[in-house]
Design a protein with these regions (language model features):
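Conserved glycine-rich cofactor-binding loop
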Residues: 17-18
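Conserved glycine-rich Rossmann-like NAD(P)H-binding loop of the short-chain dehydrogenase/reductase
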Residues: 33-47
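The beta1-alpha1 cofactor-binding region of Rossmann-like NAD(H)/NADP(H)-dependent oxidoreductases
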Residues: 42-43, 63-75, 106
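Substrate-binding pocket helix/loop in short-chain dehydrogenase/reductase
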Residues: 100-101, 108-113
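Active-site helix of classical SDR
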Residues: 124, 161
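Residue(s) in the substrate-gating loop at a strand-loop-helix junction
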Residues: 144
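C-terminal helical subdomain
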Residues: 181, 185-186, 206-249
Length: 249
C-alpha cells in the first residue's frame, strides 16, 4: 500500500549508492516518491536507478561528490529541471575514519570535515533557495548518536562533525520555519553499512566490525526518515534517535 503523503514527493538523497541512502531511496520510491540520487560511484547509482525503475518507480541518478559544491548544485538542478520542485533533501553522505587523535591523521580530519560538514552545507546551500521560493520543503540531515556523546578514544573528530550537524540543523530550523521549511535530524547508532570500513587502520576496522555485530539494518533508518516525511505539513519531527536495543553507547 502506498503512503499518500510520500507519493509524488520529489526527494533528493546524497550518498545514495549504498547503506542508508540506498535503503531510503528504495523505500521512498516504493511508496511513490520521485527520488533523485547522488553519489560518487556512478556505476552503483545507475544500478540502483535501474532497479527502482524496473519496479515501476521514479528515479534519476547523478555522479555527486559532496565535497565539490558544483556537483551538489548540479544534482539539485537536475531534480528541479526534471520535476520542477524539490520537496525533500536527505543529506546522508558521511564518512567515519576512526583513529586516536595522537595518530595525527590530519588528512582524514580534513576529509571528515569536508564530507560530514561542508558536504551537508553544500546540500543546504543548493536546495534552500528552491525551497524558499516554493514556500515549502523539508531538509533531513543525518547525524549520529556520536553527536550526543563524544566517541573516544578514536572518534573525537567524527563526533565533532556530528555535533556540528545537530547544531547546524537546529539553527537552520529556527531561521527557515517562517518559509514553511521543516528540518529533521536523524541520529543513528550502529547500522550495518560500509561506514565501518572508513578507517585506514586494519586493527580499528577489525574492532569496529566486532562492535557492529549488533548493528541494525539500514532500512530501520529508512523507515524513520519516511516517518518524518509523511507527517502533515504543520508537523515537524525535529529529531529521531534510533539505535540497536543492545547498544549501550
Amino acid at each position: 500500500m502506498r503512503t499518500a503523503s510520500i507519493a509524488d514527493k520529489v526527494v533528493v538523497i546524497t550518498g545514495a549508492s549504498s547503506g542508508l541512502g540506498e535503503s531510503t531511496a528504495r523505500l521512498l520510491a516504493a511508496n511513490g516518491a520521485k527520488v533523485v540520487l547522488g553519489a560518487r560511484r556512478k556505476d552503483r547509482i545507475d544500478a540502483v536507478v535501474k532497479e527502482i525503475t524496473a519496479k515501476g518507480g521514479s528515479a534519476l541518478g547523478f555522479k555527486t561528490d559532496v565535497t565539490k559544491r558544483v556537483e551538489v548544485e548540479a544534482l539539485v538542478k537536475g531534480a528541479t529541471e526534471k520535476h520542477g520542485r524539490i520537496d525533500v533533501i536527505v543529506n546522508n553522505s558521511g564518512i567515519m575514519p576512526i583513529a586516536p587523535m595522537a595518530a595525527l591523521k590530519v588528512d582524514e580530519w580534513d576529509r571528515m570535515i569536508d564530507v560530514n560538514i561542508k558536504g551537508l552545507l553544500y546540500g543546504v546551500a543548493a536546495v534552500l533557495p528552491v525551497m524558499q521560493k516554493q514556500k515549502q520543503g523539508h531538509i533531513i540531515n543525518i547525524a549520529s548518536v556520536a553527536g550526543f556523546k563524544v566517541f573516544a578514544p578514536g572518534g573525537v573528530v567524527y563526533s565533532a562533525t556530528k555535533f556540528a550537524v545537530r547544531a547546524l540543523t537546529e539553527g537552520l530550523r529556527m531561521e527557515v520555519k517562517a518559509d514553511n521549511i521543516r528540518c529533521t535530524i536523524i541520529s543513528p547508532g550502529a547500522v550495518a553499512t560500509e561506514l565501518t570500513e572508513s578507517s585506514s587502520e586494519e586493527a580499528i576496522r577489525k574492532n569496529l566490525r566486532e562492535f557492529y555485530k549488533i548493528a541494525i539494518p539500514p532500512d530501520s533508518i529508512a523507515r524513520a526518515i519516511a516517518y518524518a516525511i509523511e507527517q502533515p505539513a504543520e508537523v515537524e519531527i525535529d529529531e529521531v534517535v534510533i539505535r540497536p536495543t543492545a547498544l549501550e553507547y
